[in-house]
Amino acid sequence: MSIQSIVTKETLKKKDTNIEIQEKNMNDLVVSASRVIAPLWPISTFAAHHPWMGLEKQSFEQVANWLKEARNVDIYPSASMIHSAKAKGEIEESFLQIALSRWLDSQSFHMPRETAERFCQEALKLERLPSSLLSSPELNKLAEEISYVNTGSMKDSSMQPISSLIENQKGDNLSDILNYHIIKWCKLYLDDTGASWTMPNREKGFYRAWQHLITFDPALSKNERKVLKDWPEDPLIALTKALSELGISESNMQAYLEGHLLSLPGWAGMIRWRSQQSIEEQELLVEYLAVRLSMELAIVKPYLPLKNQKAEKKVSIVPLIASWIYWGDISVEKWSQMSATEQSELLAFAYRFDENTRKKLWLKAWEQTHAEQLREKIASKQRATNDKKRVVAQLAFCIDVRSEPFRRHLEKLGPFETFGIAGFFGLPIATTELGSNNSHPSLPVILKPKHQIKELTDENEYNSYEQRKKIDSSVSYTFKTMKQNVLTSMLLPEVSGPLLGLQMVTRSFVPRSVGGFIRNLRKTMLQKPNTTFSLNHVHDTNCEIPIGFTKEEKVNYVRQALKMVGLTEGFAPLVVMCGHSSQSTNNPYAAALECGACGGAAGGFNARVFATLCNLPEVREALSAEGINIPEDTIFAAAEHKTTVDELEWIYVPKLSETAQEAFDCIDSIMPNVSQHANRERLMQLPNFKTKIKNPSKEAHRFAEDWSEIRPEWGLARNASFIIGQRELTRDCDLEGRAFLHNYDWKQDESGDILASIIAGPGTVAQWINLQYYASTVAPHYYGSGNKTTQTVTAGLGVMQGNASDLLSGLPWQSVMQSDSETYHSPLRLLIVIQAPTKYIERLLNNDFTFREKVQNGWVRLASVDPEGRWKNW
C-alpha cells in the first residue's frame, strides 16, 4: 500500500475542512447567482416586482447587453413599438439627434465624422438587413478573405447550460427535456392547493423528497436513473459534484448557475421567494439547483465530453460588413480596396453601434419627449394666485395612477381637495378580517408588518356571521374536495354539470344581471355586523408581532402620514381616507388590480384603521400639543375607490358633525356624475370602444361582472411618472391616468426625512410596478405571461401556458397590448419629479446611495421643480 493511500486523522480533518470551505463557497455562489432572478410572489397576492431588482448595481445598458448575449432577450422597445410611438407624436426627432450626437462624442474613431453620422442615421431607421444580402456569395467570400482582421474585442462571453447545446436523435433539445422534468418536480413540491395526494417526504425538503422518488421515475431511462441511484444525500455536495462532472471550471461556476436560473426564471423566482419566507426552507434555492444540475448530468452524460465546449465563441463579421454595405454605402469592391486597419475600424464601429445601442438612443428620445411634454403640461397650469376656493371635504387617495382621473373629475365637479399618499397610509400592519384564521401583510412587500390588527365584533353577532359563512363556503369546499379526490372527481362532472352549465349560459349572455344578483345575494348573506379593531396594544405570546398599537405609536403613525402629505392645518369638516379595490369576475390576476401598497389586497382595511385612529381623542390631544390642531367638528371617515367601476363605497362613517354631514351629503350627491365622467374617460381607452358610450357606469359594471371579459380595466398600464409635490403643481392637469401622485410640502420637511421615506417606500413600489409593466411589454415571451385565454392556474401559485411551461411571472398580454400588433403601455422608465429646492435633491442623492445608484445606472429618471417653477433634469 502506497503512502498516498493511507488516510490519517490529519488528512481526514483536512478533507473535512476543505469540504466545509467548498460548501461555504458554493452557498456564496448560489447567493450571488440568484441576483439574476427576482422573487416571485404567488398570484393570489401578485406583488409588483421588476425582474432586474438584483442587477441595479449594473447599468440598464449593461444588463440589456448581457441579457441579449446570454438569453437572446431584448429589453429595449422593438422597432415596431418605436415607429408606432413616433407616428403618434410620442418621440421628437430632435431628441433622437441630440442622443446620437452625444453618443458619437463619447466614441473614439478615426473615420470622418460625416461618414460615421451617415451610417448611424441610416441604421437608426431600424430596418432589417436584407436576407439576400446576408446570404450573398460575394459578401461571405469577402468575410472569409478578411477574417485575419483583428476582432479580438468582439467576443461572445455568454455561458449556456450544456444541455442547451445538445440535441438527441429525435432532434429534441436536451434543455427542453430537462425543463420538462424540473417543472414536474417543482409543481409537486410547491403545490399549495391542499391536494389529497402530496409529494412523499415533502417535509424533508425539496432535494431529499426528489431523491427518494427519482429512481422510480418512468420518464427517465434506465441509464439516467442509474446515474442518480447513489447520488449524494446532501444538496450542496450533489451540486458541487454535478458541476465537477459537467466540467465547469471554478471561474465559470457562477455564470453557469445563472444560466440555469434564467432557464426557468418563473419557477426559480418562486423557489427564491419561498426560501425567504421561513428558516426551514432557506436553502431551497440550493436544493433547486442541486436537483436541476443533477438531472442535467444524468441526461447529458452519454454526450460528454462535448467537442469545442471550452472554445471561445467569436462574433460573426458577416452582418457587420453587411451593415456598412446597406447603411454606409460601402460596396464589396470598396471593402476589398481598404487596408486592414480601415476594415478593422469599420467593423469595430458597426459592432459598437449595434441594435441595442440604436434602440437605446430611441428610448432616450422617447423618454425625453415624455419629460418635455409633462414639463409643458405642468408649466401651462401653474398660476400665481392665492384665491383658494372653499373646501368642504378633503379626500386622500392612493398614489395609484388610476386615482388621478377620479381625483381630477372630483375636484372639477365639487368643492373638494384631494391628496395622494401610499394606500397603506403608513401603517405597517398585518390584518385579520372578521372570521378569518389567516392574517395578510397589508403593506408594501418591501416592508415587514410590526403590528397585528384584528377585526372584532360582539360574540353573538360573530357566531351568527360565522354560521352564515360556513353555509356559503360549504358548497365550494365540497366541490374542491370532490375535485381533488381520485374517486369523487370522476363523479363531479355528472353531479355539477347541469348547474354549472346554467351558470355558464347566464353568466355569458346576461353577465351584469346575473353577476349583480349573485353579488347582492352573497353581500346580503355575508353582511358583516358592526365591527371594531384591536387597536390597543396587547402582548400575545401566540403572535409573532404585537396586537394593536401603544398610545405613542398611534400618535406617531397619524402624525407621520399627515406630515407626509402636508395636511397639518386647514382641515375641512370631513376628511376621507380612500383605499382602493378592484372588481372583476373569473380573473386569476385580480390581485394585480388591487392595491400594490397593501400587498395585493384592497386598501379599505388600512383606510378604516387610519381614520379610526384620527378620531381618537387621545391622538388629537397629543397632536395638538405638537401644533397639529384638528378641529373638534372635523371628522375622519373611510371609503374604498372601486377602480373597475369608478365608484366610492363608504366603509366607515362615524357620527358626523353638522358641517361634516353637509360635506358627506355633498360628496354623495356629486358622486354619480363623477363616476360617469371617470368611467367614460377610462372606457374610451379600451380597444372595444371607439364610439360614444351612452351609459358609461352601466357599461363598466358589465365589464366587472362578465366572466368572459379578458380586460375589465387597464390596471396601471401606461404609467410613466411619479410626481412628488403639492396638489397645486398638477391641479387641473389632465395627466391621462399615467402619473403616480404623492403629496409633499418641502416647507414642512427641513430635515429631508419625509422626502427620503417617500423615495424609499412609495417611490420603490412605483418603480417596481413601472418596470414590471415595462418588462411585460418589451419581452412578453420571457417576462410576460402570454394570453389569458390559454393560461392554466397551477398548484395554487401562478399561471402556465399549457401544463408544462415556466411559471409565468409577468403581466398578461391583455394588460399591455391594444391588439396583436399595437401596444397600449408605453415602455418608459419611471420619471420621478420632485417639487423642492435643488439643495433638497442634492441632499437626497448624497444621503441615499441606493437611489443615487438607480438614477446613475438608468433604472429611474429624475427631475425636479424648484419653488420658482424651474424644471431640472438630473
From Swiss-Prot:
What cofactor is needed? Answer: Zn(2+)
Q: Name one GO cellular component term.
A: plasma membrane
Name the major location. membrane
* UniProt keyword annotations, A-Z: Cell membrane, Membrane, Metal-binding, Transport, Zinc
Listed binding positions for Zn(2+) are: 398, 400, 580, 595
Pfam families (UniProt xref): DabA (PF10070)
Q: Provide the protein's localization.
A: Cell membrane
Topology in the lipid bilayer? Peripheral membrane protein
UniProt-recorded Gene Ontology molecular function terms: zinc ion binding
Q: How does it assemble?
A: Forms a complex with DabB.
Q: Which family does it belong to?
A: Belongs to the inorganic carbon transporter (TC 9.A.2) DabA family.
What this chain does, per the entry, is described as: Part of an energy-coupled inorganic carbon pump.
Under which name does UniProt file this protein? Probable inorganic carbon transporter subunit DabA
**Gene name of the encoded protein:** dabA
